[in-house]
Amino acid sequence: KVVYEYIDDLNPHLAGTDELPVNVREKYEKTMKEKDSIVVVTADALQRDVLSKRGDSHLVFSCNGVDYNHFHNEIDPDFKFEKEFAEILEKGQPMIGYYGALAKWFDYQLVKELAETGKYQIVLFGIKYDDSYEKAGLDRQENVHFLGSRDYHVLQNYAAKMDVLTIPFLINEITKATSPVKLFEYMALNKPIVTTDMDECRKYQSVLIGH
């Protein structure tokens, strides 16, 4: 049998293009017609889409998860941070952290308004998925720090230094269908979590929804 993983909204922005790749569209349409194939979805919105097109035949709902041991038990208390990150720690202000893609679905305006309070150091790890970060002008905020990506094997050491971990996404068709892996990694770190009002984040009592 064919197993089709349906883990994101079919949106060209996720592919970094203006149009959805033809092969992606064709695989989706073929799967929606062939009810013998197994479809695995990770979010309620994706499940509703499948149900509307082919019913519940061979449909599996499986939200994302986490390597709990890696994020909870493999934090190195003697990890040597580079100077740039160490200097942020030395400022002594509460640190708000995010890691992941910086893309069109990221709420830059919200982060900018948070930075303008002057109460926090905001640390962003990840990749610039498109030109949205430059257009947002966050680099002009002295307390916003984009530090690039970090290897998965040491990422937990940086995240563990944050006072709050966040997922500040805009609410749109992409994020309505997102079950963020980082959400479960944040949980394993046992840190306060604040997100925007995403359906898949609302499911968990440990997540605070910002408005």
Each predicted region: which residue ranges?
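Short hydrophobic "strand-cap" motifs at the C-terminus of beta-strands
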Residues: T42, I96-G100, F125-G126, L147, ...
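Nucleotide-activated donor-binding/catalytic signature segment of Leloir-type glycosyltransferases, i.e.
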Residues: Q93, G126, S132-A159, L208-I209
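Carbohydrate-associated surface elements
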Residues: A45, S62-G65, E74, M162
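Acidic anion/phosphate-binding donor-loop and adjacent secondary structure
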Residues: L14-T17, V66-E87, K104
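Nucleotide-sugar-dependent
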Residues: H153-Y158, L165-M187, V194-S206
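Membrane-proximal helix-turn-helix segments that form the acceptor-binding/catalytic region
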Residues: Y4, L10, E19-V39
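Conserved donor-binding/catalytic core segment of Leloir-type glycosyltransferases
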Residues: F85-F106, V111-A115, K119-F125
